[in-house]
């Protein structure tokens, strides 16, 4: 239809394009790629459809399907064509397509109508007929090529050519000193050295060749393989490249390049035979940057576990890679530096038992410091921040695990920045729990400030939208007035914990879910054990059913958490417009306290709901990632 429409357009003539026709909501526009056999079957059916009682049919099964076209001869048979569904944007990310239909108006004028945006593509798979036809064409082409290149000329025939006598060049006078016969001066030592160098590199272990190339610069896998093949690679080593890269290199998800892991730099040899003098100088610079700062990093880490944003931007300890890069514009943000002097050193991310008391007193920061969000299950550490986006026929539905609606399972605003309600409440509950904890209790995980946990999220901190600025205001709410009632709230929380559990340690465990992580709680979440890689369509359907079963609950919890956060955002915006110390300013403070108490009474299970919401977020994102990986594997297997 598209080809016919294009053929009907005339040069030097204008056409009007009508978009957004009414009544077209039930039409899905697809880009169909047919084989020659399928086209011939459709054309045959079109020419004999009045004589054939059956009609063509198409059936979708996930990302695959079956197309049935009736035959004219034999009469009652059909031709089956398998096909698979893919996303047009993934195959051609630089362009997009609209489906245009050419029609004739009542006046006879030609006009164009836009039927919709093409998002999905159907590719019909080749059949045995297609393979047989290709084989016959190849045989015919070979025969024609052979006939053109070979001609038998019989003696006395019409194709006998003229004989051409070729004069021999006169022999040159022999030189009395044959050693002088050298057209250009050559140094054979260079040639021997090059040959020896190439051969010696190809004889080295494949792993050593990989790490010595990655030590100089980052390579993408195809580039690295092409570079290795210059020196010679056998098939066995070529197949083991992926396993070696997983062992010795880190993958940069932005450009899919590989960089050498830090511990492998100790294995490098400066006199590697494949290195030129320039390569050795480059290696010296890399090694001096990698090995020497590691000592400085260890000493500075023992002195101060948290570095300010200024140090993070200028310190050479950080690897100069995209994964650890911190924007220099972060220098002006002083929120981390307030916490630097107030958090005690940690050992592997945990507080020493002797440091618990000091950390307990440090949890409520002063007004100038940022309030770290204590998240029981931080969704920002999802293994799938951007799951594979595969598309099927309902690709516009965000509530399906294979849909494109990644806005439903992103890093949520309430879990990324934290709500002020949680900050205000945990300010007291965490301190109360830590102070009542005996020295011999479980290890405590010291909460890291949000700026250190997520440095990448602040790359564009100076270009924040108004919405992001409002979210940051949550963390900057002044709590001077709250400290006046600290003792009352402390006693209230202590009494609440005592009533909730007869055992003080159990009460601490229940009330401090956000700030405590016992060593026994380091087990994997249940969904990581239950939901493993998908190997069948039945397993995929079960995962999809589980996703849909809990999706509504997740959305409801998410909406409740966001509602709580927005109340305090609004109050904080009012407070910022007032001058400190004024009566209106104090009134807003009182309103914040009242709202805090109101939320606390109306939502006594706030922490449990937030934990459940973040648990569902991680679980659904995990399921969505598995389904996306399975769909991507199936689509690649059809290509």
Swiss-Prot record:
Residues 378-401 have a biased composition (Low complexity). Keywords: Nucleus, Phosphoprotein, Transcription, Transcription regulation, Ubl conjugation. Residues 457-469 have a biased composition (Basic residues). Residues 291-317 have a biased composition (Polar residues). Ubiquitinated by SIAH1, leading to its degradation by the proteasome. Interaction with AFF4 stabilizes ELL2 and prevents ELL2 ubiquitination. It is found in: Nucleus. Residues 480-490 have a biased composition (Acidic residues). Residues 525-635 form the OCEL domain. Residues 470-479 have a biased composition (Basic and acidic residues). This is RNA polymerase II elongation factor ELL2. It comes from Mus musculus (Mouse). The lineage of its organism: Eukaryota, Metazoa, Chordata, Craniata, Vertebrata. The gene is Ell2.
